[in-house]
């Protein structure tokens, strides 16, 4: 496995900001590399010296449990040094700009910065600023507003492909598979990134949700839209439910959580419409009894949520490794 990691990689991307222009070959490379690191994480000693001496900064301006912790564990498993930034206790509270904060870490020798922000486009702006300074630092988008969440979509892709072939996860395994994404599509950066990856890999993507949370613009991504759940679920191989982002929506978009669950909540009865062997995904955090019932979430025969979390560490290890040059420091 370690010999495979030392092989030359056709990776030319400096940043991971969006999946809109990711190629099938790049998805294949990420999956292959993540598969190798998944083997590392299954060992008793879950650490390799690959990025020893490198500095990874987690620049999170928005609350996060899974994503920040996953990036931290990924960097530490690669033996990198990790700095976790807290906006609440930083000089931002004194009027410092995000760019000045980033430049401060640049002066301290960071190699990769992971940026999460409530506003769309911030990671891209940070990347442009670093490029204008002539810095070789790479930027990873860990979620920006309603725009994208590339690493979540990559770990979802890895979860699906390893389920279909644990020994050789590859994008073409999703060809012809019906994948349904249900919920607050309008505000979901996860949905946008997953649309990019799943369609590129040959998946048949269907979106379902209330008309107020599922605008027609999503057809341009190659998805089929449904405002009624039953037709969307018919013959589905995978169903991904999304959290209702009440903090981003006005009261006029949704009558009530109870009404939403009645019309769009995933229950065992509704799963009968899907293909035999259907599996469930959720990027988290989950509102139990709203997006899907608790018994489904806790059923290991149906739920892939724990596998998604596990996949996240391996996928983020792969991205850090590839951005660092695909070789040990």
From Swiss-Prot:
Residues in a coiled coil are: none
Query: From the UniProt record, which GO molecular function terms apply?
Result: amino acid binding; aspartate carbamoyltransferase activity
Instruction: List the GO biological process terms.
Output: 'de novo' pyrimidine nucleobase biosynthetic process; 'de novo' UMP biosynthetic process; amino acid metabolic process
Query: Which positions in this protein are listed as binding carbamoyl phosphate?
Result: 66-67, 116, 149, 152, 284-285
Reactions catalysed according to its record = carbamoyl phosphate + L-aspartate = N-carbamoyl-L-aspartate + phosphate + H(+)
Q: Name one Pfam family in it.
A: OTCace_N
Give residues annotated as binding L-aspartate: 94, 189, 243
Checking SUPFAM superfamilies in the record gives: Aspartate/ornithine carbamoyltransferase
Please name the pathway. Pyrimidine metabolism; UMP biosynthesis via de novo pathway; (S)-dihydroorotate from bicarbonate: step 2/3
Concerning its family, UniProt says: Belongs to the aspartate/ornithine carbamoyltransferase superfamily. ATCase family.
Q: Summarize the protein's role.
A: Catalyzes the condensation of carbamoyl phosphate and aspartate to form carbamoyl aspartate and inorganic phosphate, the committed step in the de novo pyrimidine nucleotide biosynthesis pathway.
Q: How does it assemble?
A: Heterododecamer (2C3:3R2) of six catalytic PyrB chains organized as two trimers (C3), and six regulatory PyrI chains organized as three dimers (R2).
The molecule here is called Aspartate carbamoyltransferase catalytic subunit
Native source organism of the sequence: Gloeobacter violaceus (strain ATCC 29082 / PCC 7421)
Gene expressing this chain: pyrB
